[in-house]
Amino acid sequence: MSRIGKKIVLLPTNISTQFDGQTITVNGPKGTLLRTLPEGITLEINDGTILVQTSGNSKRANQLHGLSRTLISNMIEGVSTGFSKKLQIQGVGYRSQIDNNNLILSVGYSHVVTIQPPQNIEIKVENNTSITVLGIDKEVVGQVASSIRSIRPPEPYKGKGIRYQGEVVRTKAGKAGKGK
């Protein structure tokens, strides 16, 4: 059995869950999330707790036991408090802005890059160089933040580009040059 999978998931009072077949639905103040669990994973929902169990001795179910518990825990956290990912833009003339819910990036290309966020994802821009991605689904928030970063990842010489807040970029020394 998985050490993580054995842990009980606590349900806050403002969260309601339903489990039908292999599908779990979590409702909360921020929204609703739906996920299909793999075969061999069962849930036992009691007053205020969820216990994730494997049915039978399936090797695949044992492998996905801890993952399923963590995904359910993330769903509960998402609909109650939400998730956020912060990005920083570094570079002379690099900036961002919001226009009709679309993120517009000016990051050194000959054109501006426009990103339309998916459903249930909100993007905020503070002082043109700080981007915050907000949402209830941790996986989608991470994917959107990753796609924004991939537009101009930090380069290793001066560190210009888009990076996660707190990310440390290892810089290289430039060319040694010719001795004169």
UniProtKB/Swiss-Prot annotation:
Which Gene Ontology molecular function entries are recorded, alphabetically?
Answer: rRNA binding; structural constituent of ribosome
GO biological process: any one? cytoplasmic translation
Q: Does the keyword Phosphoprotein apply?
A: no
GO cellular component term, pick one: chloroplast
* Listed PROSITE patterns: RIBOSOMAL_L6_1 (PS00525)
Annotated keywords: Chloroplast, Plastid, Ribonucleoprotein, Ribosomal protein, RNA-binding, rRNA-binding
PANTHER family tied to this protein: 60S/50S RIBOSOMAL PROTEIN L6/L9 (PTHR11655), LARGE RIBOSOMAL SUBUNIT PROTEIN UL6M (PTHR11655:SF14)
Assembly and interaction partners: Part of the 50S ribosomal subunit.
| Known function | Binds 23S rRNA.
Q: What is this protein's record name?
A: Large ribosomal subunit protein uL6c
Q: Which organism is it from?
A: Porphyra purpurea (Red seaweed)
Instruction: Print the organism lineage.
Output: Eukaryota, Rhodophyta, Bangiophyceae, Bangiales, Bangiaceae
